[in-house]
Every structure is written in C-alpha cells, then in structure tokens.
C-alpha cells in the first residue's frame, strides 16, 4: 500500500507514532511498511490482507544481532554463556513489550476482534509489533541507520540492570539452583492461587512459602514470584551460602 493509499487519518497516526522515535532521517521511512508492521495477524485473519508476521520475523533477527553486537563491544570480559544469558533477557517478550509501551505502540496497533479482548496475549502482541517495527525501519533504508540511535541506549540501560542482577533476569532458574544448594534435590513449587488474568502464584520450598507474584501471563507471574522468593531465601540463608 503506497502512502497515497493510506487514509489521511491513518497517515496522521503513523506520523505521530514515528515522531516518538526522533528518527535521524524521518523522510526515509516507508509509511506503507510502518503501517504493515502495526497490523496484527488477528486483523488479517478477520479482514484479509497483509499483516506484520514477516516483518516481525525480520525484526527479531535484527534485534538479536544488535543485542549481541552491543554486548560484544560493551564488555570484553563477558563469556559467551554470559552474553547469551543477558541477550535472552534483552530480547524477551517482557522487555520488548515494556519498550513498546514506552512508545505507546498499542495505541497504533490494529488488531482483530479475537485479540482485542485477549489480555493474556497482550505482552506477546506488543513484543511482536515492536519487532515488526524494527523490521520496517530496516527495510525502509536497507541498513540500521534508523534503528541504532534510539535503540542502543535502551539496550545499554537494560543490559546494565540485568548484569547487576545475580539471577541475570532468569529468576526461576536462579531460584532452582539456590534451593538445590540448600537441600539436594529440592525444587521450588509454584502454586496457582488466582487463575486470572492477572495470574497469581506462590512459591514454596523447604516446607514454607517464600514469595508470590502476579502478572498478565502465568510465565511472568511465576518469574515475579521467583524473584521475591530468591531474595527472601538469600537473606534467610546468607551465612549458609557463604
């Protein structure tokens, strides 16, 4: 769809959205590609036409490349394993959805009826849309010039936070390692106490409750519960772990 085929209202919406990124060369942006990046598959399933699936695939690969390059240059002492762990957080649905919310992407995302009331899928929709926008920016110029200036500061800020976290953002894995250090074979038990959404989980280990967490998805609720439980266990057994 060329720019002339976009309705004046939609084009105005796209211009407002693009302005949030303070692009270095806004005139190079393809409005047709940006429009497509903001069409969720639920809309194309309902109304026909193109959606952002392919752009999301491209954007996912670009994000992984940029995150890997950033970590490679940021700290020469990071091992491959450490870089992999940090990158997995940088490009996670939760991290990307938070970035998308910062740019109000949901306001411009076109979704079908089947998805409009699906709160459970909101994080994935936002993350996929964000990746699709990355893909659209790349295809607009054929390079990373429209992406690096605004994305790298986000990666730097998040990477700093993740690397300062001993769990590297994977609280469930860190909690499991911790419980096994304290008692061989001991695994945390996640108990669903509110079927939601939002979902709420409690984490039990060593015969007692250590934390709880709430989130729009079961995965996120468990991670939040594990984060609190990890901190509580570390505090309670600090001497034993030294």
From Swiss-Prot:
The segment(s) forming the DRBM domain are 170-235
What domain of life does the UniProt record list for this protein's source? Bacteria
Q: Which reaction does it catalyse?
A: Endonucleolytic cleavage to 5'-phosphomonoester
Q: Where in the cell is it found?
A: Cytoplasm
Keyword Nuclease recorded: yes
Q: Which keywords annotate this record?
A: Cytoplasm, Endonuclease, Hydrolase, Magnesium, Metal-binding, mRNA processing, Nuclease, RNA-binding, rRNA processing, rRNA-binding, tRNA processing
Statement: the UniProt record of this protein carries the keyword DNA-binding = no
Please list the residues that make up the active site: 60, 131
Give binding positions for Mg(2+).
56, 128, 131
Major place of residence = cytoplasm
Q: Which cofactors?
A: Mg(2+)
User: Which molecular function GO terms apply here?
Assistant: double-stranded RNA binding; metal ion binding; ribonuclease III activity; rRNA binding
Provide the family line. Answer: Belongs to the ribonuclease III family.
Subunit composition and interactions: Homodimer.
Name used for this protein in its record: Ribonuclease 3
Source organism (scientific name): Gloeobacter violaceus (strain ATCC 29082 / PCC 7421)
């Amino acid at each position: 769809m060329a720019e002339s085929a976009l309705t004046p209202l939609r084009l105005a919406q796209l211009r407002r959205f693009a302005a949030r990124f303070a692009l270095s060369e806004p005139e190079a942006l393809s409005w047709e590609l940006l429009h497509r990046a903001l069409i969720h598959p639920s809309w194309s399933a309902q109304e026909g036409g193109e959606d952002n699936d392919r752009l999301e695939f491209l954007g996912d690969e670009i994000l992984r490349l940029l995150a890997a390059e950033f970590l490679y240059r940021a700290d020469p002492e990071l091992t491959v394993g450490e870089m992999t762990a940090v990158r997995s957080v940088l490009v996670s649905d939760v991290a990307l959805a938070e970035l998308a919310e910062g740019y109000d992407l949901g306001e411009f995302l076109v979704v079908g009826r089947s998805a409009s009331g699906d709160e459970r899928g909101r994080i994935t929709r936002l993350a996929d849309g964000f990746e699709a926008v990355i893909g659209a920016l790349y295809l607009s110029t054929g390079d990373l010039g429209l992406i690096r200036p605004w994305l790298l500061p986000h990666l730097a800020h998040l990477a700093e936070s993740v690397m300062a976290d001993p769990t590297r953002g994977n609280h469930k894995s860190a909690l499991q390692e911790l419980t096994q250090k304290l008692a061989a074979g001991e695994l945390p038990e996640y108990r669903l106490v509110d079927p939601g959404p939002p979902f709420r989980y409690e984490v039990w280990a060593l015969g007692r409750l250590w934390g709880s967490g709430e989130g729009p998805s079961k995965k996120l609720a468990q991670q939040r519960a594990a984060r609190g439980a990890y901190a509580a266990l570390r505090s309670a057994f600090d001497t034993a772990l030294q």
